[in-house]
Amino acid sequence: KELEDVQIAIEKAKKEAKQFEADRDTWKRACDSIKDEYRTVSNDLNTKIIEWAANNRTSEITKLLVSQLEMPEETVEENVLSRMVNLKKDVDADEIVAILCKKFEEAGRVISKDDAYNYLISIVQNYITVFAGEPGTGKTSLCKLLAKALGLYDSRFAEILVERGWTSSKDLVGYYNPLTKEIESTQPRFSECMKKLNEENANNIVEAPYLVLLDEANLSPIEFYWSNFNYYCDDPTHQVVSYSNGEKYEFGSELKFLATINYDQTTADLSPRFLDRAWVISMNPVSVDVIVSGLMDDSVVENNSEVISLETLNNIFDWHNVKDKKMNQITKTRLDRIIDKMKEGGHTISARSIHLISHYYLVAEMFMSSKEVALDYAISQKILPCINGNGKQYKEFLNGLMTICKENQLNKSASIVSKILEKSEHEFYSFFSL
């Protein structure tokens, strides 16, 4: 009985298969017929269009169509890169600092020469420089003033407004769209920057830095959308941004990132991995009088008419020029005391960070008002951003750290630690709660 049922089912399946084949042939013939009909109609339509055009040569529409067809093809002019005519090479450190201080003064801000040297050394030596502070402390305007002082603001400065919800590098560098077969630009200003630097490197005419400002950079986790560039922090001399279609942009250390971040609870934390690679400058609060009077205004300041060359900036402020120098023993002892103290708070200062501090100091000591001031800037911007802990024991560690800073005339660092202690809530202490 079961065998008979199986045989019946097989026969039924065979009949259905034959029917499917017959249906398939029927549909195939129908499709072929439709294709033939389409070709016939299409040919007839083309014939009628040609006949109509022949009989209506004087009509306005035909004249327009013919004129368009007879127009010569436009010649596409290649964008030939040329050398900068306003490039400034014969300038020394004092002159650059004087220009910077003047631009700040024009904007209603006063900075010391030490501050000016600090900004310049930080930007030249580091791949990304972070300006941290409360909203309204002038972080963004400071970055714009730096670009204007160096003559970069009009053509070699891109301001990127970071938004919430950025989750990958696509939000910054764009992506290849397989439907349009084109690179979709999510940040046009940055895409323009990459194209320009790629062309300059291909033609070997890189003459000036290009500053990219990530404004309110921690509205989204930086490590997510900046992942393409995190790799190049140690050696930015050959950077590559690649897309899935094989297209890529290549450029070098002329690209410098600036970032502004706010101290509040609505932003993403900076990871230890990022802090190990970045240089963080803490911004002092702006006085109420200055804010109310509206004296601070970077928009009234014009871009410097001359562009300070990349070669000049590197020759003056880069650490490679002092790589054979060594930190003096007194300064090394001071630094070692700070590093050892940080270990008590659970913070191991990496070899990378120590190298960055050393590089900064060896250049800064030549220009700043004292060796102590040079070391003070380095510690406050490379070591203190690591501060993040809680409890009575951590408070004792911070008090001890502040004492060491005071004993070694590291006044800026001592002041920062003091503010961290003052602003703590529920015995939670963080550099980014200043």
What are these regions, as identified by a protein language model?
Residues K1-L434:
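C-terminal regulatory/interaction module of P-loop NTP-utilizing enzymes
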